[in-house]
Amino acid sequence: WHFGYKAHIGADTDTGLIHTLETTAGNVSDVSMTSKLLTGTEEEVNGDAGYVGANKRKDAITRNKFGKKIKYRICRRPSTLKKLSRSGQYKARKAEYRKSSVRCKVEHVFGVVKNLFRCRKTRYRGKAKVDSQLKMVFALANLFLADTRYGLQA
């Protein structure tokens, strides 16, 4: 049998620390989890191409708790860049580079979890057990990242 799970995370762009974790089956799309990952205090949302159209969904959160409009900065799919003219491609690639430089903070957390804590494959069968394992590992990753970035001392 084959089974897989996804860890959808919401991370703070300033600190790079995780504030939300949702575990789903592997066949659940990223864009369907967007509203569950937001805390309500965001001013902008950054995501990869898997989140295209997140602001147009029925369950999309368009305003934060303070009434300000949330800016969705989602990377474009590479195939849409090929359709542009040469000068348009140059400008679009620069804009995509700026978006992905913010998004790399989230990807860095996944690198810590996979490489430092060796959490590459699921060790359990069942969503509840996998969810518990991922919450523990991501909490440890938060502690590790906070310690390396801010030098927290006991």
Language model region names:
Residues 1-62, 68, 77, 137-141:
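Polybasic low-complexity intrinsically disordered regions
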Residues 14, 118, 144:
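Residue-level marker of positions within ordered structural domains that often coincide
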Residues 36-39, 129-130, 154:
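Short, charged/polar low-complexity linear motifs in solvent-exposed/disordered segments
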Residues 43-44, 49-132:
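Helix-centered, glycine/charged polyanion-binding patches within enzymatic domains
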Residues 135-144, 149:
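Aspartic protease catalytic domain
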